[in-house]
């Protein structure tokens, strides 16, 4: 985002930062949170030593089973569907995958053509159903921008699922994480799915995303 994470910003958001920190359930999570905030302020790379984890560790926390109803927001060419299947022994109940970029979506369709119990949408995820400008030249990092010749439809997860269950939601929505969560309030309340979201696109997401999710639940 355009925000500068400095002492003034930290002071202004102290209450929210403290509230988000208090939601964390273990010492390592608190250390990660504290070190990342300090890294944002100072840019000191050594603060990231000892707080990074590999994908296997992250997925061990998610503890995915063989009967998941998976929602993939930003499925690119199908690589994250494959990643999901890798951790569920290739088994699942249902997959809903969204990809806004036309070229990527064609690859996704081809990649998943033999799969059953799956639906694909050429859409981006957002807080509500609308049309937004996308920078589609960024490949897997296609993102919402203020001005572009490429208009892309986006939709709320709640609208797409229409009350159907979700047990695991992964989002790669390039900075629209807050809006995406707003668009899945009903899904979160009803099914409390496991979430795999990014909190690095905007400085403030590290505290505002946990607070938003906690407030909904």
Predicted regions and their residues:
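Phosphate/nucleotide-binding beta-alpha loop and adjacent structural elements of enzyme active sites
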Residues: 1-217
């Amino acid at each position: 985002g355009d925000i500068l994470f400095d002492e003034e910003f930290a002071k202004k958001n102290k209450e929210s930062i403290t509230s988000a920190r208090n939601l964390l359930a273990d010492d390592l999570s608190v250390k990660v949170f504290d070190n990342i905030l300090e890294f944002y302020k100072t840019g000191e790379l050594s603060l990231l030593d000892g707080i990074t984890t590999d994908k296997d560790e992250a997925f061990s926390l998610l503890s995915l089973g063989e009967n998941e109803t998976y929602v993939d927001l930003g499925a690119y060419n199908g690589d994250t569907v494959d990643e999901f299947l890798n951790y569920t022994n290739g088994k699942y109940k249902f997959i809903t995958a969204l990809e806004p970029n036309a070229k990527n979506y064609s690859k996704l369709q081809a990649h998943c053509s033999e799969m059953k119990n799956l639906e694909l949408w050429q859409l981006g995820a957002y807080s509500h159903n609308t049309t937004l400008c996308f920078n589609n030249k960024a490949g897997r990092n296609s993102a919402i921008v203020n001005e572009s010749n490429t208009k892309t439809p986006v939709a709320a997860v709640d609208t797409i699922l229409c009350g159907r269950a979700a047990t695991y939601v992964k989002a790669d929505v390039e900075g629209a994480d807050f809006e995406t969560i707003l668009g899945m309030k009903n899904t979160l309340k009803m099914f409390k799915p496991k979430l795999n979201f990014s909190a690095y696109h905007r400085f403030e997401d590290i505290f505002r995303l946990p607070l938003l999710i906690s407030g909904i639940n």
